[in-house]
């Protein structure tokens, strides 16, 4: 079947009032960015829905696949757009029915927005259904539980006919809900946390702490790949890579072993707080899950949060681990997250970390050494990468260059 348009239905932005135009315009920009570098389409954003006009050479499956990841889209339908001509309506519906399996059932559903159209809803349903049965005797009508449903929308500008409704990502268009800094560890949880806030329209930049030579280049590439997967859904993401080796070594020198994890998280939060102000973000996001590990009890969170006045969002706080894993698999981050490359949170993990840290002891241990200069130095030496869905690591680029030289 040759479709000439895609009908894109909006998600929650349909609930917006005076700001609706801003949400629609942002979604239109996000759609255009998601479809780069594809060709053969033209995007038209309207108040109640979006239409994407397709030329014959357009790769409709690839376009739909990309659109299905764009937040703010409820669903997508390949449609046939025709003039308000009854014979054309019949012929287009008959063409759709040719793809139905032999022995299957169907119904015709009509939405008549243009009340001036000659036939009313029921008359058009009967006319089109009769035309289909006349041309295709391998299928029958079932209005209660059909295998297929041909939908006809009689709108003011034209008539749209379709059968498939493909689920979108839902949520709100990214870019309409402020900016956050995601603490991206490389594990299962933090990429999912990032996606959860993106789905609410929030723009995300990511921060990752690495401690060479204790953490490997492969661990760094793993985080870059996770960022690339996230970028498939929202466009380019800035990844801030923080050199954290010296701070971790100093923590292990002066802080009681049971408290090193608490102090490590506090130093990460202090650095994140500074980056938040540099990039004009509104909050910090992490993948913490209540009670999952020692640093994620309420007392630990209190001690860690104490170093910043910036709001810390924890989208996964009360989810079961199984639910988080399920989300990670659906998003395509799980297989990358479980690659066995240690991050800086695991390499110095004490055997018996405190789960209920005494706040006064935390302050006492950290007061032995002034970490301010080390923190400033780490911030000054941050490496920032802009990662899009086509980004390749330095190793991959080197391999590509070598292959090119060989051939």
Swiss-Prot record:
It comes from the Bacteria. ATP binds at residues 183-184, 208-209, 265, 287, 296. Residues 61-165 form the THUMP domain. It is an enzyme of class 2 (transferase). InterPro entries: Rossmann-like_a/b/a_fold, ThiI_AANH, ThiI_fer, ThiI_N, THUMP_dom, THUMP_ThiI, tRNA_STrfase, tRNA_sulfurtransferase_ThiI. Pathway: Cofactor biosynthesis; thiamine diphosphate biosynthesis. One of its GO terms (biological process) is tRNA 4-thiouridine biosynthesis. It catalyses: [ThiI sulfur-carrier protein]-S-sulfanyl-L-cysteine + a uridine in tRNA + 2 reduced [2Fe-2S]-[ferredoxin] + ATP + H(+) = [ThiI sulfur-carrier protein]-L-cysteine + a 4-thiouridine in tRNA + 2 oxidized [2Fe-2S]-[ferredoxin] + AMP + diphosphate; [ThiS sulfur-carrier protein]-C-terminal Gly-Gly-AMP + S-sulfanyl-L-cysteinyl-[cysteine desulfurase] + AH2 = [ThiS sulfur-carrier protein]-C-terminal-Gly-aminoethanethioate + L-cysteinyl-[cysteine desulfurase] + A + AMP + 2 H(+). GO terms for cellular component: cytosol. Catalyzes the ATP-dependent transfer of a sulfur to tRNA to produce 4-thiouridine in position 8 of tRNAs, which functions as a near-UV photosensor. Also catalyzes the transfer of sulfur to the sulfur carrier protein ThiS, forming ThiS-thiocarboxylate. This is a step in the synthesis of thiazole, in the thiamine biosynthesis pathway. The sulfur is donated as persulfide by IscS. HAMAP family: ThiI (MF_00021). Belongs to the ThiI family. This is Probable tRNA sulfurtransferase. It comes from Staphylococcus epidermidis (strain ATCC 35984 / DSM 28319 / BCRC 17069 / CCUG 31568 / BM 3577 / RP62A).
């Amino acid at each position: 079947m040759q479709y000439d348009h895609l009908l894109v239905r909006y998600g929650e932005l349909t609930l917006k009032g005076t700001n609706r135009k801003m949400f629609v315009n942002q979604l239109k920009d996000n759609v255009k960015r998601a479809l780069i570098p594809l060709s053969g389409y033209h995007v038209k954003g309207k108040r109640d829905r979006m239409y994407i006009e397709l030329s014959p050479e357009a790769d409709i499956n690839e376009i739909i696949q990309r659109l299905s990841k764009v937040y703010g889209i409820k669903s997508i339908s390949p449609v046939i757009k025709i003039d308000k001509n009854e014979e054309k309506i019949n012929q287009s519906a008959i063409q759709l029915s040719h793809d139905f399996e032999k022995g299957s059932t169907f119904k015709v559903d009509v939405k008549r927005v243009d009340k001036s159209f000659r036939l009313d809803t029921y008359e058009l349903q009967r006319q089109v259904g009769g035309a289909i049965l006349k041309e295709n005797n391998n299928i029958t009508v079932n209005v209660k539980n059909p295998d297929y449903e041909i939908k006809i929308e009689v709108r003011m500008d034209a008539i749209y006919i379709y059968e498939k409704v493909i689920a979108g990502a839902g949520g709100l268009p990214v870019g309409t809900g402020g900016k956050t800094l995601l603490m991206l560890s490389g594990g299962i949880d933090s990429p999912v946390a990032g996606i959860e806030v993106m789905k609410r329209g929030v723009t995300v930049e990511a921060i990752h702490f690495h401690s060479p030579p204790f953490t490997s280049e492969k661990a760094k590439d793993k985080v870059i790949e996770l960022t690339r997967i996230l970028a498939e859904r929202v466009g380019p993401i800035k990844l801030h890579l923080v050199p954290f080796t010296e701070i971790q070594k100093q923590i292990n020198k002066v802080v009681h072993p049971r408290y090193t994890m608490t102090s490590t998280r506090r130093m990460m939060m202090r650095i994140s707080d500074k980056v938040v102000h540099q990039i004009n973000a509104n909050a910090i996001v992490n993948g913490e899950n209540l009670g999952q590990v020692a640093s994620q009890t309420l007392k630990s969170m209190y001690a860690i949060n104490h170093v910043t006045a910036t709001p810390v969002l924890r989208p996964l706080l009360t989810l079961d681990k199984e639910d988080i894993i399920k989300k990670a698999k659906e998003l395509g981050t799980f297989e990358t997250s479980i690659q066995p490359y240690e991050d800086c949170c695991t390499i110095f993990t004490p055997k018996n970390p405190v789960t209920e840290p005494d706040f006064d002891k935390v302050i006492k241990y950290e007061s032995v050494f002034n970490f301010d200069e080390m923190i400033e130095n780490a911030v000054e030496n941050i490496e920032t990468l802009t990662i899009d869905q086509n980004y390749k690591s330095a190793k991959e680029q080197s391999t590509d260059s070598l292959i090119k030289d060989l051939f």
